[in-house]
Amino acid sequence: AKKRLMTFENVKVAVLGLAFKPGTDDLREAPALDNVRLLLEHGADVVCYDPIAAANFHKLYPQIKMANSVEETLEGAFCCFIFTEWEEFIRLTPETFRRKMRVPLVYDGRNIFDPEHMKRGGVEYYSIGR
């Protein structure tokens, strides 16, 4: 993502999903922990959303803005990272990313979308670990 954007300095980055897995507020070994730390170290303006784990995550990273919805998280973002496969994320459409984000650039660590569908929908999409 840094190679694509050149810098994260003062760039809004959306993070969807903080929990280790859906249906829990458990953060143990959650990929979001290290990745958010790296984004902060590179100067990103990180905005996170998780329907259950946000409060626990905010205790660890009180400086991070926690959004109240997916739409608020994506609004004006230059890129989005998905770290938990919550059902409400799976239901998102390429149009939602295009409409809300400044740059519809998505890095999906859970492989919840079909890459071809996202690309046809106008989203620059990277499925990590597929």
What does each model-found stretch correspond to?
Residues 1-130:
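Structural/interface elements that position substrates and couple domains in central-metabolism enzymes
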